[in-house]
C-alpha cells in the first residue's frame, strides 16, 4: 500500500486505487475503452479509459471491486461509456458477492453526450439499488460530487468526504437566496458530516486507513 503525504498535491485516480489495495493486486478492466460520442467534435478529444479506471484487487486478502474517476479526462465527467464501465463492474461484483468502492472526483454530467449521459446516470442508480443489501457499497468523495452524482452517496452503505477538496452537493451553496460558500458552505465535508450525509471525513491518508 502506497500512502501519499497529505501535504502534497492531490493523488491521481490510479494512485488512489493503489493506496487502498494490497500491493500489486490491482487488475484493470476496460483500459482501452474511450468515449463513443462524436457530437461537438468529441472524436477529436483524447479520452483514455473514458475518465474512469475500473478493476478489482484485494484488501487484506479479500476481493474488492473499485472504480476511480480521473478528473484529468474531461473533468472525470460521466458519459455513456464511463457509466457502462461502472455498471459492468457492479455486475461482476454481484456475481462474486464482493464489495464495490467508488472513488469520486467528477465534474458531473458530460453535457456533450446529452441524453446518453443522462441514461448513464440512471443505469448507475439502478445497479446500485439492485445491489443494496447484497454487496457492501462504499463511496469516497475526493473532489466534486455534485448534481445527480450526489445520489451515489445516499445509495452507498458508507460515504467518506475529503475535508479540503471534497464537495458533495445537489445544488451549489449560492442556490440559496442570499447565501454563498463563505457564509455557509453546504457542499463542504464538515456540513455534510453534521447533516448526517457522510459517515466520516478527513484527509486522503485518513480515508485510505478507513477504506482498508
Where are these regions (language model features)?
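Conserved small/polar residues in nucleotide/adenosyl-binding loops
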Residues: 1-5, 209-212
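An N-cap/entry alpha-helix motif that binds or orients negatively charged groups
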Residues: 4-54
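Hydrophobic (often cysteine-bearing) scaffold residues that line and stabilize catalytic clefts
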Residues: 13, 82, 208
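Glycine-rich anion/phosphate-binding loops
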Residues: 50, 76-88
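A structural preference for short, pocket-lining loop segments at secondary-structure junctions
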Residues: 56-70, 85-112
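Glycine-rich, flexible beta-strand/loop modules in the N-terminal catalytic cores of phosphate-handling
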Residues: 69-77
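Conserved catalytic cores of soluble enzyme domains
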Residues: 104-211
Amino acid at each position: 500500500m502506497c500512502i501519499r503525504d497529505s501535504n502534497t498535491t492531490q493523488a491521481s485516480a490510479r494512485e488512489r486505487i493503489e493506496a487502498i489495495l494490497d500491493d500489486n493486486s490491482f487488475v484493470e478492466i476496460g483500459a482501452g475503452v474511450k468515449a463513443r460520442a462524436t457530437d461537438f467534435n468529441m472524436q477529436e478529444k483524447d479520452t483514455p479509459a473514458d475518465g474512469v479506471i475500473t478493476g478489482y484487487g484485494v484488501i487484506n486478502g479479500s476481493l474488492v471491486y473499485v472504480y476511480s474517476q480521473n478528473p484529468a479526462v474531461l473533468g472525470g465527467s460521466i458519459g455513456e461509456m464511463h457509466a457502462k464501465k461502472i455498471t459492468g463492474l457492479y455486475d461482476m461484483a454481484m456475481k462474486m458477492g464482493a464489495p464495490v468502492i467508488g472513488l469520486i472526483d467528477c465534474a458531473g454530467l458530460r453535457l456533450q453526450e446529452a441524453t446518453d449521459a443522462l441514461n448513464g446516470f440512471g443505469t448507475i442508480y439502478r445497479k446500485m439499488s439492485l445491489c443494496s443489501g447484497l454487496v457492501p457499497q462504499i463511496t469516497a468523495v475526493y473532489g466534486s460530487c455534485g448534481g445527480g452524482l450526489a445520489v451515489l452517496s445516499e445509495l452507498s452503505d458508507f460515504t467518506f468526504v475529503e475535508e479540503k477538496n471534497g464537495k458533495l452537493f445537489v445544488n451549489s451553496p449560492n442556490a440559496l437566496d442570499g447565501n454563498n460558500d463563505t457564509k455557509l458552505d453546504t457542499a463542504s465535508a464538515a456540513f455534510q458530516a453534521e447533516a448526517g450525509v457522510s459517515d466520516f471525513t478527513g484527509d486522503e491518508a485518513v480515508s485510505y486507513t478507513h477504506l482498508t
